[in-house]
């Protein structure tokens, strides 16, 4: 069976997924571009395309609000199944409209969605047009199901898929011992009795500013580590303002190191103001960590049983 996927960039978790799917079918993946802006290039360096054919419409960085008409060629090209993953990027948007005009059936796979009840009428109608015309949907959560139905999908056409960056071998069968945890803390030069970590880009949407504000009076025997890049002046100023010597900013880490950070920690906090999924929740839970996140994180809403394996808090 010939399957053609359309997606934005070669995110490592997508490459892993496509390599597995390519074992089951004749898979071709059309990427809009090679990279996204403001993402460390090391993120892509372990990508290995093995079991599928890759096509890049553009070299370099993706331009979400420009149309690359090269995509239309691959909408018309013969295959058994068309699958789209983005309805909000202009290039895939025009491809979805083109598929509709050609009366081609297609599957819409989305990672998540948050309903915008206050959006203007034109934007809402465009979303409904783009979402409602799929012949089938792949959704990772109940919240995403609600999103799809709100924008015109028929509930009986929605199918569940597991959205993750993990292989089964990555998941701990049991939590590591205190001895192993302490060895990791020694390896990473961590002197604290308890450790809280968070992972993500230093951008307002990730909510690190209000997390720092919330933890400014935390006991100094608790170490707080935010991992994911170079902090902007705003976050450095907050650290100085609150005299938080126990707050540390850690640069980009590869997968092996990230897994070690999860294992050595006592708590994972993800204070996002909006994430249509949030794969770090899957990752933290796979290493036995309790998680605190907000009601604007779809993976948290799907995976956390409040008070059992973590807590959902109301976004600021």
Predicted regions and their residues:
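Conserved donor-binding/catalytic core segment of Leloir-type glycosyltransferases
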Residues: 4, 189-206, 212-215
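Short alpha-helical donor nucleotide-sugar binding micro-motif in glycosyltransferases
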Residues: 252-253, 260-265
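Short hydrophobic beta-strand element within catalytic cores of glycosyltransferases
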Residues: 290-294
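Nucleotide-activated donor-binding/catalytic signature segment of Leloir-type glycosyltransferases, i.e.
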Residues: 236-253
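Aromatic "clamp/platform" in nucleotide-sugar-dependent glycosyltransferases that forms part
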Residues: 273
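Donor nucleotide-sugar binding/catalytic pocket of nucleotide-sugar-dependent glycosyltransferases
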Residues: 132-182, 190
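A short, histidine- and acid-enriched strand-loop-helix "catalytic/donor-clamping" loop
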Residues: 90, 104-122, 133-136, 140, ...
